[in-house]
Protein backbone atom coordinates (compact mmCIF):
# COMPACT_ATOMS: atom_id res chain seq x y z
CA UNK A 1 0.00 0.00 0.00
CA UNK A 2 1.29 3.47 -0.87
CA UNK A 3 0.42 6.63 0.99
CA UNK A 4 0.80 10.18 -0.33
CA UNK A 5 0.57 13.07 2.13
CA UNK A 6 -1.38 16.18 1.17
CA UNK A 7 -0.58 19.87 1.65
CA UNK A 8 2.02 20.40 4.44
CA UNK A 9 1.79 16.86 5.84
CA UNK A 10 4.74 14.49 6.28
CA UNK A 11 5.00 10.71 6.62
CA UNK A 12 7.72 9.90 9.15
CA UNK A 13 9.20 6.55 10.17
CA UNK A 14 10.09 6.79 13.85
CA UNK A 15 13.69 5.89 14.72
CA UNK A 16 14.16 3.43 17.55
CA UNK A 17 15.63 4.51 20.88
CA UNK A 18 18.70 2.71 22.22
CA UNK A 19 17.51 0.24 24.87
CA UNK A 20 20.71 0.43 26.92
CA UNK A 21 21.55 2.99 29.57
CA UNK A 22 24.82 4.93 29.49
CA UNK A 23 26.17 2.41 32.00
CA UNK A 24 25.35 -0.53 29.70
CA UNK A 25 22.23 -1.76 31.52
CA UNK A 26 19.58 -3.18 29.18
CA UNK A 27 16.29 -1.37 29.77
CA UNK A 28 12.84 -2.96 29.59
CA UNK A 29 10.35 -1.76 27.00
CA UNK A 30 8.31 -0.05 29.74
CA UNK A 31 11.26 2.12 30.81
CA UNK A 32 12.25 3.19 27.29
CA UNK A 33 10.27 6.18 26.03
CA UNK A 34 9.38 6.49 22.36
CA UNK A 35 11.76 8.50 20.23
CA UNK A 36 10.68 11.86 18.87
CA UNK A 37 13.14 11.50 16.00
CA UNK A 38 12.41 9.98 12.62
CA UNK A 39 13.14 9.86 8.90
CA UNK A 40 10.81 11.60 6.45
CA UNK A 41 9.70 9.07 3.83
CA UNK A 42 7.11 11.25 2.04
CA UNK A 43 6.19 14.94 1.97
CA UNK A 44 3.21 16.85 0.64
CA UNK A 45 3.48 19.65 -1.91
CA UNK A 46 3.13 22.43 0.68
CA UNK A 47 0.32 24.39 2.26
CA UNK A 48 -1.93 26.18 -0.24
CA UNK A 49 -1.83 29.95 0.18
CA UNK A 50 -4.75 32.35 -0.27
CA UNK A 51 -3.46 33.37 -3.71
CA UNK A 52 -3.61 29.71 -4.84
CA UNK A 53 0.13 29.10 -4.82
CA UNK A 54 1.83 26.66 -2.47
CA UNK A 55 4.28 27.51 0.29
CA UNK A 56 7.55 25.66 -0.21
CA UNK A 57 8.37 22.87 2.25
CA UNK A 58 11.58 23.20 4.29
CA UNK A 59 11.50 19.51 5.21
CA UNK A 60 12.42 17.11 2.39
CA UNK A 61 12.18 13.35 1.88
CA UNK A 62 15.19 11.69 3.52
CA UNK A 63 15.61 14.33 6.24
CA UNK A 64 15.97 13.11 9.81
CA UNK A 65 13.79 15.31 11.99
CA UNK A 66 13.01 15.92 15.64
CA UNK A 67 9.28 16.42 16.06
CA UNK A 68 6.73 17.41 18.66
CA UNK A 69 5.06 14.10 19.52
CA UNK A 70 1.76 15.38 20.82
CA UNK A 71 -1.72 16.38 19.81
CA UNK A 72 -2.25 16.28 16.05
CA UNK A 73 0.30 13.55 15.31
CA UNK A 74 -1.46 10.53 13.82
CA UNK A 75 -0.14 6.96 13.78
CA UNK A 76 -0.81 4.61 10.86
CA UNK A 77 0.28 0.98 10.41
CA UNK A 78 1.16 -0.18 6.91
CA UNK A 79 2.92 -3.34 5.81
CA UNK A 80 3.73 -4.21 9.43
CA UNK A 81 5.45 -0.88 10.14
CA UNK A 82 4.24 2.10 12.13
CA UNK A 83 4.34 5.52 10.46
CA UNK A 84 3.52 8.97 11.77
CA UNK A 85 1.52 11.55 9.86
CA UNK A 86 2.31 15.05 11.02
CA UNK A 87 2.31 18.64 9.84
CA UNK A 88 5.51 20.41 8.91
CA UNK A 89 4.80 22.77 11.83
CA UNK A 90 5.20 19.77 14.21
CA UNK A 91 8.87 19.49 13.15
CA UNK A 92 11.14 21.20 15.67
CA UNK A 93 14.49 20.63 13.91
CA UNK A 94 16.25 18.89 11.02
CA UNK A 95 19.24 16.76 12.09
CA UNK A 96 22.26 17.46 9.88
Curated annotation (Swiss-Prot):
Subcellular location: Cytoplasm
Record has Chaperone as a keyword: yes
Main location (coarse class): cytoplasm
Entry annotated with the keyword Cytoplasm: yes
Keywords: Chaperone, Cytoplasm
GO biological process: chaperone cofactor-dependent protein refolding
Molecular-function GO term, any one: protein folding chaperone
UniProt GO cellular component terms: cytoplasm
TM stretches of this protein: none
Protein task: Together with the chaperonin GroEL, plays an essential role in assisting protein folding. The GroEL-GroES system forms a nano-cage that allows encapsulation of the non-native substrate proteins and provides a physical environment optimized to promote and accelerate protein folding. GroES binds to the apical surface of the GroEL ring, thereby capping the opening of the GroEL channel.
NCBIfam families from the UniProt entry: PRK00364.1-1
Subunit-level organization: Heptamer of 7 subunits arranged in a ring. Interacts with the chaperonin GroEL.
Family statement: Belongs to the GroES chaperonin family.
Name of this chain's protein: Co-chaperonin GroES 2
Gene name per UniProt: groES2
